[in-house]
Amino acid sequence: MMDKRLVKISKTLSMLLRHHPEKLGLVLDQYGRTDWKTLVRRFNAHYQMHLDRQVLQAIMAQSTKKRFALEGTTIRAVYGHSVPVMPLTPATEPPQWLYHGTSHQAATVIAKEGLLPMNRDFVHLSEDVATARQVGARHDTHPVIYRIAARDAAKNGILFYPTSSRVWLVSELPARFLHHLTSYFRRP
């Protein structure tokens, strides 16, 4: 588990690289990458936190979710963007099943309209029920879990993009590929 300082830095980086690069005047390329040295210089000048390569490596090593990738002289958020970016990986055949955790309130809309990206570029799908439950529990104490017929959806022209953190991205998914599993209780 990360200490509070690293969590705060990680959340700030996520906000900048996923949603608001303009707060530091960062320019993201089409894949969401920005210059590492520029980010560090502006981050350290603007925030009351210290960021360097060692700090980022500690965040990456201690986090169960791989949120960031250092690629040569650039850094990017791996997924979760609300600013328009292209997936780094080509569309790939997904596993037979993927999963999505959500709130009961959202589930009523999802059952009719399918999965839509809402304020993001892509819908995020998990490779396992436990991760979907964890994601859904952020929005509802008893999240609704959907099992996605991913391979069937792919055969019907839906493109799936894998990430390095066992999250799959899809632009949207019609309701016919979703199977309501159940509501899960958050474990103590």
Curated annotation (Swiss-Prot):
SUPFAM superfamilies: ADP-ribosylation. It is an enzyme of class 2 (transferase). GO terms for molecular function: NAD+ poly-ADP-ribosyltransferase activity; tRNA 2'-phosphotransferase activity. Gene3D superfamilies: 3.20.170.30, RNA 2'-phosphotransferase, Tpt1/KptA family, N-terminal domain. Keywords: NAD, Transferase. GO terms for biological process: tRNA splicing, via endonucleolytic cleavage and ligation. Its EC number is 2.7.1.-. Removes the 2'-phosphate from RNA via an intermediate in which the phosphate is ADP-ribosylated by NAD followed by a presumed transesterification to release the RNA and generate ADP-ribose 1''-2''-cyclic phosphate (APPR>P). May function as an ADP-ribosylase. Belongs to the KptA/TPT1 family. This is Probable RNA 2'-phosphotransferase. It comes from Lacticaseibacillus paracasei (strain ATCC 334 / BCRC 17002 / CCUG 31169 / CIP 107868 / KCTC 3260 / NRRL B-441).
